[in-house]
Amino acid sequence: MSSRGKWSWLHSPITGGILLIIAATTALFWANLAPSLYHHAWHDALFSVSSGFSATIYSISLHQIVNEFLMAIFFFFIGLEMKRELLDDDLSTLKKAALPLFSALGGVVLPASIYYFFNAGTDTVNGWGIPMATDIAFALGVLAMVGSRVPLSLKIFLSALAIGDDLMAVLVIAIFYTEQIFVNELLVGFLGLIVLAVANKMGVRNRLVYYSIGLIIVWISFLASGVHATIAGVAVAFTIPSRREISMGNYLITAKGLLSGLDKERHNKADVLTKNAISSLREIRDLSYQASNPLQLKEEALHPISALFIVPLFALGNAGVIVDDSMLAELTNPIVLGIAAGLIIGKPLGIFLFAKLLTLLKLGQLPEGVTWRHIIGTGFLAGMGFTMSLFISDLAFSEPEQKIVAKVAVLLASIISGIVGYLILISAPVIKKDNKLNS
């Protein structure tokens, strides 16, 4: 078995989904069995900076490190996914991209409107962005559990829909959940982005250039500007090169020549290679890098870090809410009603209605093998807001009580949406290539 095959489970959406469930469950047990320990572990300052004998001028907690630094890396990964999807054949033209992106718009507008309906005129109306989010890791994980009963084109549709959803969520965070903007710091951040864009245009592929400028200049500047630092992650991702240095045809021609030169090493059983062999192998390695897409290489490298470390750690630090008898009374809270109805009803209904409208207008069509039942089931999976919804709830509310109520609503709605979506898809008739239905 190749090393790639041996570790392929690290890239499975099921693995990420299982870890996310374990982390969220652990957070709930931890917060309810040892609430004081949970709070101190995540919110006490890990270190602080003081000026002489004056009070602390800066401190940072584990919760802040996760939400402001590690989540910026997660959003960088999301940005890489967005750019790759937009360049991919499945979304490379307006006609192909229209259905999932327009459906994503419906899955944003209707949930936000439902939340606004329940909370209009109150101090909780600012949470309208919470039910518009989709947790792509959870959604794809559940879809993977359905297996071959759904066509591959549905996974592509869900991925594209989630990318559109994430793009709108990022814009909402940048525009509506930024309280105060310091222009000078923001301009420095934009200057860093311009430098990276120029480097991309000039063909610079050195990852150190993009990581150092992205972290030292862009991320710190955005953090200081008042714009949430996660936006810097997405912005930097769009400056990452996506062009190969050599074509696959030229790669194959050159690689075959180098491999033929290694033919004389066929019978060399010694562990020590000849200088010729070392040189040829090094050239093949460099050639393989030149034939690769830098954007895809970074995305592949970050996927396990994001799915298996950052997102579960975020869930561990943000999903811990104390569940007691008082929570039952909160089930009629406008925050709970708005989030739950938005995710459970608004998401699938908005996605279905906007997709239906586009097909009726002949501006788009369902992917091959996908039925309207699949679209509805996928809509429910998109209602699993979890990570993104928890993240936005932390930005939307300043009162701890409101944050707790919102988190409970997100957890309940995500579980219900996931179960309903799974049941709809697992019970859907299988459509074979001859278009005959099979139960």
Curated annotation (Swiss-Prot):
GO terms for cellular component: plasma membrane. One of its GO terms (molecular function) is sodium:proton antiporter activity. Its main location: membrane. It catalyses: Na(+)(in) + 2 H(+)(out) = Na(+)(out) + 2 H(+)(in). One of its GO terms (biological process) is regulation of pH. Pfam families: Na_H_antiport_1. The chain crosses the membrane at residues 14-34, 60-80, 98-118, 127-147, 156-176, 179-199, 213-233, 303-323, 335-355, 375-395, 408-428. Belongs to the NhaA Na(+)/H(+) (TC 2.A.33) antiporter family. Na(+)/H(+) antiporter that extrudes sodium in exchange for external protons. It comes from the Bacteria. The keyword Transport applies. This is Na(+)/H(+) antiporter NhaA 1. The keyword Cell membrane applies. It is found in: Cell inner membrane. Keywords: Antiport, Cell inner membrane, Cell membrane, Ion transport, Membrane, Sodium, Sodium transport, Transmembrane, Transmembrane helix, Transport. InterPro entries: Na/H_antiporter_dom_sf (IPR023171), NhaA (IPR004670). It comes from Psychromonas ingrahamii (strain DSM 17664 / CCUG 51855 / 37). The lineage of its organism: Bacteria, Pseudomonadati, Pseudomonadota, Gammaproteobacteria, Alteromonadales.
